[in-house]
Amino acid sequence: MKKWLGFSLTPPLRICNSEEEELRHDGSDVWRYDINFDHHHHDEDVPKVEDLLSNSHQTEYPINHNQTNVNCTTVVNRLNPPGYLLHDQTVVTPHYPNLDPNLSNDYGGFERVGSVSVFKSWLEQGTPAFPLSSHYVTEEAGTSNNISHFSNEETGYNTNGSMLSLALSHGACSDLINESNVSARVEEPVKVDEKRKRLVVKPQVKESVPRKSVDSYGQRTSQYRGVTRHRWTGRYEAHLWDNSCKKEGQTRRGRQVYLGGYDEEEKAARAYDLAALKYWGPTTHLNFPLSNYEKEIEELNNMNRQEFVAMLRRNSSGFSRGASVYRGVTRHHQHGRWQARIGRVAGNKDLYLGTFSTQEEAAEAYDIAAIKFRGLNAVTNFDINRYDVKRICSSSTIVDSDQAKHSPTSSGAGH
């Protein structure tokens, strides 16, 4: 309550001497409201603050010995005309001597609920909305007493003689004005700066479309089973995982079987399908329908796994690091002749077999060396029945192609 009013409701008692007379700026006497109280009139009724603040009780109280009557409500309304706001006005509080010993010194009536409600109703009915002003001084003509504004700078209290208005302090009024401004601002529509709006773009859901060979450039994966793309050359390679064998030291059973490199993704996928049919039969998963491989199924039935894989490699577009379709044959990059090599025979290194004018001569040289080191299980470019296997295996050196081919073969050449 005290914070809302901006002043204390329990002011100290103050009795002014009757000898104190103040002069206005024009030299006239100033009538003081809080003087000329008789300390011996204990039987007289003492006015209460509730009666001063109530609009319904317009009781006139004697002020001095001259029986000067001042109507409190009239003075309040007179001194607070509409259109003025007392900013710098000090709070006016009437000071009465404690004439009744039964009354408390702290004017506890303001602290009761009824007094607070009366004061609020007085504020709502008797105090209009005031515009801002710095000073307010009023003089009432035609009355027996001169009323003027007088402020006591020493005590900080307004000692205006007949001014009984309890004006709101500057802080309380500013709080009320601020509250009204806040309510007005809430009712205003909120304006949004269009320039600072963020454009929230919802991500469009992309439909899953099967990848094409052009879209998968630079990626190692493919839309086909068993096909990968070389990260450097961009060519497609086909691989098959053979889980029928396990070497020592391997954590995963089986080995990867290389089926050759291809320029087109579909060719690599077909090579995988043919190898899968040879290893696991027609019930395996394929990239294309089984009806597309009717002719190839007849051929693969006449060969074992190694021979069929060798045939797939020879038919690939980039076999054995060169342009030749034969196993172990490469083309020299300077003079363009064909070279034959075989690997993993001499200390796990490649063995150079010579340079030849044609791919077929180089391929025959590779077949003879493969039979020499691997026997009848060797994977050759041509049919192994063309060669004299016993003579090749019994020789301490690698024989030439003429000696290897013309030698008669009795038996044991069927794989």
Curated annotation (Swiss-Prot):
Family annotation (InterPro entries): AP2/ERF_dom, AP2/ERF_dom_sf, DNA-bd_dom_sf
PROSITE patterns attached to this UniProt entry: AP2_ERF (PS51032)
Keyword Ubl conjugation in record: no
Summary of the tissues where the protein is detected: Expressed in roots, seedlings, inflorescence, and siliques. Also detected at low levels in leaves.
Protein's GO biological process: ethylene-activated signaling pathway
Entries under CDD domains matching the protein: AP2
GO molecular function, one term: transcription cis-regulatory region binding
Cellular compartment(s): Nucleus
Membrane recorded as keyword: no
Function: Probably acts as a transcriptional activator. Binds to the GCC-box pathogenesis-related promoter element. May be involved in the regulation of gene expression by stress factors and by components of stress signal transduction pathways.
Family the UniProt entry places it in: Belongs to the AP2/ERF transcription factor family. AP2 subfamily.
Quaternary context: Interacts with ANL2, HDG2 and HDG10, and possibly with GL2, HDG3, ATML1 and PDF2.
Name under which the protein is recorded: AP2-like ethylene-responsive transcription factor AIL1
Organism: Arabidopsis thaliana (Mouse-ear cress)
Gene: AIL1
